[in-house]
Amino acid sequence: MQIPNRLQPFYENLVFERHDNQMVINFGPQHPSAHGQLRLILELEGEKVTRAVPDVGYLHRGMEKMGENMIYNEFIPTTDRMDYIAASSNNHAFALTVEKLLGIEVPRRAKVIRMMIVELNRIISHLFWLATHALDVGAMSIFLYCFREREFAMDLMEDYCGARLTHSSIRIGGVPLDLPAGWLEKLKSFLEKMPENIALYEGLLSENRIWKMRLENVGIITPEMAKSWGCSGVALRGSGIQWDLRKEQPYELYDEVEFDIPVSDSGDSYGRYKLYMEEMRQTVKILHQLIEMYPSTSSEIMAHAPQYISAPKEQIMTQNYSLMQHFVLVTQGMRPPVGEVYCATESPKGELGFFIRSEGEPYPYRLKIRAPSFYHTGILQDLLPGGYIADVVTIIGNLNIVFGEIDR
């Protein structure tokens, strides 16, 4: 038996031309501005970047393979660890995919609560992005202001599900809990302050000379680049392409709420910053409408599908059949029909999608995750050359990547 040769890391095959004034350096994988375990191999001429090669994989945990060895419900807490800044968005996309495979309809109240949770996560994610991006560029005050508001939003998540970061707040078939007493009033109070806070952030940054010098005409993504690299979210809309899955392929109740999709034609980092600010305003608008919709919905928060979904807790505690059914679903898992589905949502960072191939077993035969940050990291090899070494940190931070969903 012939022993196979050791697999060679891809960078061992890279060839860099040697000439005067040329330098090859490593950026990361341990770097405070890498926003995770990112390694960049940069070729420089003076302070100009002439070549950039992203190297990912330092945070790889085999999530897709883990999902293929877990029953469907068990995988939900694992999705929290992908984009851990907006954990509920991951729960939501996975739950929608399984529900599409099962062919079940979620109760209206559960849809309203889900939308509240994921839109609140969008604000949390955008505030975290602005805080860390501004800190990378050298603005300290905005970091403190953003984390102040983010703390209120995280308190709301903790009041609902008991967790601040990894929420596991959405279930296949609905949501585990109705909104606690007084929660809507707290949310309304938070939303009433957000327009003033967003105006404060813009007042500190939008006309700041240093901020504009660091972001304007830096990291320009053309429409052709955005489409060829598979960009989505703000990275795509910042290049003049109006595409948001909440509008183009509505899910839950997004076709019943009014909101605008901000678009910028500049393609640069400053244009993307302005989009993030406007997106927070639109999210506040959506949440106000959801607060008005909530009281008119029935109290049901889980789908009625005994073959796949456990009965309400009251029935499990009082009826033998419901208890036995719950025991089977928890220990052995549901058995979806044979087939394959893909479902995507508009997460805070772009299009987050799950592909599931089912063979009728309690475990997926194949689970594939389409994470937006993976594509936004790949584009760095086209985006960084031609700029300065000082712009590398600006561009990485501006693209809003998170490595939990890249190395999956």
UniProtKB/Swiss-Prot annotation:
It is found in: Cell inner membrane. The gene is nuoD. Its main location: membrane. NDH-1 shuttles electrons from NADH, via FMN and iron-sulfur (Fe-S) centers, to quinones in the respiratory chain. The immediate electron acceptor for the enzyme in this species is believed to be ubiquinone. Couples the redox reaction to proton translocation (for every two electrons transferred, four hydrogen ions are translocated across the cytoplasmic membrane), and thus conserves the redox energy in a proton gradient. It comes from Wolinella succinogenes (strain ATCC 29543 / DSM 1740 / CCUG 13145 / JCM 31913 / LMG 7466 / NCTC 11488 / FDC 602W). SUPFAM superfamilies: HydB/Nqo4-like. This is NADH-quinone oxidoreductase subunit D. One of its GO terms (molecular function) is NAD binding. One of its GO terms (cellular component) is plasma membrane. Pfam families: Complex1_49kDa.
